[in-house]
Amino acid sequence: MLNIVMHTPKSFCILPWISLESTAAGWIKPCCMYNINMTDDNNQPFNLNNNTLDDAWQSEYYRNLRQDFLDGKMPEGCTRCWSEEASGKVSKRIRDNARFKHHITNDMLENPKIKSLDLKLGNICNL
């Protein structure tokens, strides 16, 4: 197994191990910058109307996303961060890796736990 403390791939992002977010429409994503829909085993987008947070967290999609980062890949849904970094800006990925660096451990790789949950529930009155 990769020793994440000793060797963090250059493209690594901690968020898939510690974070979930939802949009006001209920779409579940690893972060607000992720620009494609996460999908379930039936290729249906994860949505709070049909799925639990645990469904997304434990999904093959999320496991594959985590593995892509460990393999040094640059996942397609993260193009906003890659674009910011290519233009010399400090991306959300870089800021959050620094912010949450104390969570980057080998145990985190084996037992990912939600540490940051951002639920955007919208502002439509339901009375």
Task: Give residue spans per PLM region.
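A Trp-anchored, charged/polar loop motif used as the substrate-binding/catalytic surface
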Residues: F100-M108
